[in-house]
């Protein structure tokens, strides 16, 4: 069955998506391209970036631009945003910024090292803040920032103290920044639960049979994990100019896992 094309009202807008070469970020890029936006995807792997551009063109007939960027580096974040500005030309406004780059690892507190702490916080917290900071000069009236956190920011998960803390920080950052940038710029946060992505596949491999996708699905009221298109739809809706009265909000896309 052919997927029904949705209209988010983003035609002619410019969007930058970190973590845009795979998973939720890539699907968000696809939907925004399909909607007529100009899309720049950021990621560390040039190979994945090239593959993502090919995939997006194949799916939409439109061209996204890949820019290498490690969001844990202030210099690389600034370079990436300045590259977008140079390509866009005079009077550039960044209409949509999606902070989708993320890092996940399950570890109990007694297992954590300082290096583990630094690695998790560097991507999930510092990376979100650094890229947003680099984008600030180009976030103008009507711009929207969408940060990607997790259901783990809203309720505790076993063996995930550090990950929960890092995503909780993203939620707090979202709410504080929404106050700082109002009324010109909207800042919101989307919190997905387990979604069928390469990151989830790696999580199951790392579990080494300790639990399976079926085990994971059984924990959800909807009896399944999410799909990237379901989360990307919410991200695009939150970023849409049609949601112009929405800021400082935290939206769970979690199959009901945080309801109980």
Residue ranges and their predicted role:
Residues 137, 178-183, 244:
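Alpha-helical segment proximal to the catalytic Tyr-Lys
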Residues 132, 166, 174:
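Active-site helix of classical SDR
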